[in-house]
Amino acid sequence: MKNEFSIKFNFPDGILGFEEIKEFIIKDSEYKPFSIMQSINGEINFLVTSPFNFLEKYLPNIEEKDWLDVQAENEDEKVILCIINMHVKTYKEITANLKAPIILNKKKLIGKQAISTNEEHYLRYRVFKE
């Protein structure tokens, strides 16, 4: 059995489309730099990664209220992830949702899906394309 790193986060508001799911585990994936964000019951899985892995100058313009909702006041508590989509037809196009990032307080283990107010961010930003 391989070692697997995972952390449980509480999402008081759930995430968009899955508001009823309040707890997710974020765990390592064998496909770096991606991680898996999985509901506690294991029924819902998302592939996630830091947007800074592919977009060095990502500026999401997240509202201060959103950071307060996850009780993150200091920069060292804040983590931003984005949900990754692999398009089923070819699996060759990978996009990231930059418009609605997952924000986390890594110390208090609280998360939320926020909305970026930066007009340059799209729901389907091409991360990789063959």
UniProtKB/Swiss-Prot annotation:
Q: Where in the cell is it found?
A: Cytoplasm
Keywords per UniProt: Bacterial flagellum biogenesis, Chaperone, Cytoplasm, Translation regulation
Please give the biological process terms from Gene Ontology that the record holds: bacterial-type flagellum assembly; regulation of translation
Matches recorded under SUPFAM superfamilies:
BH3618-like (SSF141457)
Cellular component GO terms, alphabetically?
A: cytoplasm
A Pfam family assignment: FliW
Q: What is its main location?
A: cytoplasm
Q: What does this protein do?
A: Acts as an anti-CsrA protein, binds CsrA and prevents it from repressing translation of its target genes, one of which is flagellin. Binds to flagellin and participates in the assembly of the flagellum.
Similarity remark: Belongs to the FliW family.
The protein's assembly and partners: Interacts with translational regulator CsrA and flagellin(s).
What is this protein called in UniProt? Flagellar assembly factor FliW
What is the species listed in this Swiss-Prot or TrEMBL entry? Borrelia hermsii (strain HS1 / DAH)
